[in-house]
A protein has these predicted regions:
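Metal-associated gating/positioning segment near the N- to mid-region
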Residues: 1-31
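Short N-terminal helix-initiation segments at or just after the protein's N-terminus
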Residues: 7-9, 33, 117-121
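Residues that form or flank phosphate/diphosphate-binding pockets in enzymes
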Residues: 15, 48, 75-76
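A glycine-rich helix N-cap at a beta->alpha junction
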Residues: 27-41
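Histidine/acidic residue-rich metal-binding segments in metalloenzymes
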Residues: 52-69, 73-171
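Structural detector of well-ordered beta-strand residues that form the stable sheet scaffold
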Residues: 3-6, 37, 96, 151
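Short acidic, glycine/proline-enriched helix-loop-strand junctions
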Residues: 19, 34, 91-93
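Active-site mouth loops of central-metabolism enzymes
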Residues: 9-12, 37-50, 69, 124-130
């Protein structure tokens, strides 16, 4: 059976990572009957977060975190992602990335809505293969620039799987 779970603890804009971890531990306190830890979701990489909070949390054992290139409340721009990747390299942490091109998805979604295409099946149309492959290629390039390991998550296209394989072959 399962003896450990590692869910995501999500930071929201303006929120301290220490507060996020404390809140998630409080949610589990007295309820968890198995071991648990947290992957952190970084959505507001301020100087305070990157300079103090995240290094301290990594030292405490929170060695993996996730960033997004899409979703209004979660996405980071390339500069912010570079800052997170640089910190991960320095501190020996692992960055996971949900890679999709936000603007492509937004543009396609708006066109679909304008055309009256509102059924749930059009969600997949708005999240086109190109949106994933472009963002994954860009994120892999940023990780290669800094020579830092990266885990691209939620891979749904052969193009991205091939891109990851090529990056692994390059080392």
């Amino acid at each position: 059976g399962n003896t450990t779970t590692i869910p995501f603890a999500a930071q929201h804009h303006g929120q301290s990572l220490r507060d996020v971890v404390r809140d998630y531990h409080q949610r589990a306190a007295g309820k968890a009957v198995i071991d648990y830890a947290f992957h952190l979701i970084i959505s507001d990489p301020t100087e305070q977060v990157l300079g103090q909070e995240l290094p301290a949390l990594i030292a405490d054992g929170y060695i993996s975190f996730k960033v997004y290139t899409t979703y209004d409340m979660l996405r980071l721009d390339d500069y912010q992602i570079l800052e997170v990747l640089a910190l991960a390299r320095r501190e020996g942490a692992l960055v996971m990335v949900h890679a999709e091109n936000h603007e492509v998805i937004r543009w396609l979604g708006e066109r679909l809505l304008e055309g009256g295409y509102r059924a749930p099946k059009y969600h997949a149309v708005a999240h086109a293969r190109l949106a994933e492959s472009e963002a994954a290629h860009r994120i892999i390039a940023l990780a290669e620039l800094l020579d830092v390991p990266l885990l691209v998550v939620h891979v749904s296209t052969a193009e991205v799987a091939d891109e990851i394989r090529r990056a692994q072959d390059r080392g």
